[in-house]
From Swiss-Prot:
PROSITE patterns: AA_TRNA_LIGASE_I. It is found in: Cytoplasm. Monomer. This is Glutamate--tRNA ligase. Belongs to the class-I aminoacyl-tRNA synthetase family. Glutamate--tRNA ligase type 1 subfamily. It comes from Vibrio vulnificus (strain CMCP6). Catalyzes the attachment of glutamate to tRNA(Glu) in a two-step reaction: glutamate is first activated by ATP to form Glu-AMP and then transferred to the acceptor end of tRNA(Glu). Pfam families: Anticodon_2, tRNA-synt_1c. It catalyses: tRNA(Glu) + L-glutamate + ATP = L-glutamyl-tRNA(Glu) + AMP + diphosphate. Its EC number is 6.1.1.17.
């Protein structure tokens, strides 16, 4: 048997953290078993669907690297198939027409609640029975699935263990509306059957749907897949995850400067574990992933942990990979990397200091863009009269360099200190402000080497002009 999983979001909003984790688990399980992963868009809610949401889901999946083997399939393109299966159940008396109006059903529900009964559809209720018997062909009706009245549905959830639901707790589900459109629970079953889905991995909010769907699988003569229901994700305060906890769309994490590999690593650990290991390569995730290692308990979303992982991956990933994802942020800032050193060299030098790609993009502009003003606080502190001579000596020495290497630039700074009998801080900080425009950067000799001789010379001259103007206005 080839394992086949699916991710089946509804296009009523963006791909959020919970959905992304479900997609990741489904993708990982398929990969770990040498199987296939299907993407299906469950767009039967015609009033709430949007193309914008479809695009956002596809973009989020692609950004996370969760490529699908089949799809995306759209349920709205399969209505003929669903109706064929509804008609099959009608012909076999496993479904029936119900003519009870919404108003009548509301009235019956109110009676049940008044009698302290569980509100549910009851085909044998005298009022509902009378409405169905009085109906004529052509009157508006829904189609209901004839749920078994006896026994119970039992299934072995791969995360939660044995689950049993009595059929007496389930009413006859509507499988086709009065407008002729099929309903969610029915479409899902037909899709999973037609697409050969063997394992359904989804959120625990679907547990109540599962016994209903199992009865429909069996009525259709379809194989019942294996189910695994994941616990919800909570905020770090124990409340259901919401926007105030940082529960934003996947692409907003892109916008905030997270790497897909970091978000995937974080999401896989929100419920699944392998000993105490925290860092997992994609290959390790695939090789180690199993459904029975997913916890039944809810997981708490911790932004600090995600940030720590992101910093780890910025520091340790192939600079080419970081550069690929940094490019979007550079484009937002109008930074063109053809105007300076190789971006991979800059990432190697600066990346370790950054928790996000936004921080990284903010810190590397001076490698590629000239500036016409220094950071006010840094200039006030370090571009003073006392820095004039050290900068002048440094300028002469860098202009005279024939080999522009980090080692030679380091020696220039050391020679300035020796020649003027000053400490490193007397030249290092003024030089840093001069060549970067600010007071923070990696080692200034390495920064100068990447910026290049022409720019370094021009910027030291600009700093000297700034000092001269400052002294003139003092």
């Amino acid at each position: 048997m080839t394992v086949k999983t699916r991710f089946a979001p509804s296009p009523t909003g963006y791909l959020h953290v919970g959905g992304a984790r479900t997609a990741l688990y489904s993708w990982l399980y398929a990969k770990s078993q040498g199987g296939e992963f299907v993407l299906r868009i469950e767009d039967t809610d015609l009033e709430r669907n949007s193309q914008e949401a479809v695009d956002a889901i596809l973009e989020g999946m692609q950004w996370l690297g969760l490529e699908w083997n089949e799809g995306p399939y759209f349920q709205t393109q399969r209505f003929d198939r669903y109706n064929e299966m509804v008609d099959k159940l009608l012909a076999e008396d496993k479904a029936y027409k119900c003519y009870a109006s919404k108003e009548l059903l509301d009235e019956v529900r109110a009676e049940q609640e008044a009698n302290k009964e569980m509100p549910r559809y009851d085909a044998e209720h005298p009022k509902i029975k009378a409405a169905n018997e009085a109906a004529k062909d052509g009157d508006p009706c829904v189609i209901r699935f004839r749920n078994p009245k006896e026994g119970s549905v039992v299934f072995e959830d791969q995360i939660r263990g044995r689950i049993e639901i009595s059929n007496s707790q389930m009413d006859d589900l509507i499988i086709r509306r009065t407008d002729g459109s099929p309903t969610y629970n029915f479409c899902v079953v037909v899709d999973d059957w037609d697409m050969g889905i063997t394992h359904v991995i989804r959120g625990e909010d679907h547990i109540n749907n599962t016994p209903r769907q199992i009865n429909i699988y069996e009525a259709l003569g379809a194989p019942v897949p294996t189910f695994a229901h994941c616990a919800m994700i909570l905020g770090d305060d124990g409340a259901k995850l919401s926007k105030r906890h940082g529960a934003v769309s996947v692409m907003q994490y892109r916008d905030m400067g997270y790497l897909p590999v970091a978000l995937n690593n974080y999401l896989v650990r929100l419920g699944w574990s392998h000993g105490d290991q925290e860092i997992f390569s994609q290959e390790e995730m695939i090789n180690l992933f199993s459904l029975n290692a997913i916890s039944k308990s809810a997981s708490a979303f911790n932004t600090d942990k995600l940030l720590w992982l992101n910093n780890h991956y910025i520091k340790t990933s192939d600079p080419e990979y970081v550069a690929e994802h940094l490019q979007w942020h550079l484009d937002q800032k109008g930074i063109k990397t053809e105007n300076g050193p190789a971006i991979t060299d800059v990432i190697k030098l600066v990346g370790e200091r950054c928790n996000t790609l936004v921080e990284l993009a903010d810190q590397i502009g001076y490698f590629y863009q000239d500036f016409d003003a220094f950071d006010a606080d840094a200039a006030k502190k370090h571009l003073r009269g006392v820095a004039k001579q050290p900068l002048e000596v440094a300028l002469a020495k860098v202009e005279a360099l024939t080999e522009w290497t980090t080692e030679n630039l380091h020696q220039v700074i050391a020679d300035v200190c020796t020649e003027l009998e000053i400490g490193m801080g007397k030249i290092g900080m003024p030089l840093r402000v001069a060549v970067t425009g600010g007071g923070q950067s990696p080692s200034v000799d390495a920064v100068m080497q990447l910026i290049g001789k022409e720019r370094v010379v021009a910027r030291i001259k600009m700093a000297l002009a700034f000092i001269a103007e400052r002294e003139a206005n003092a």
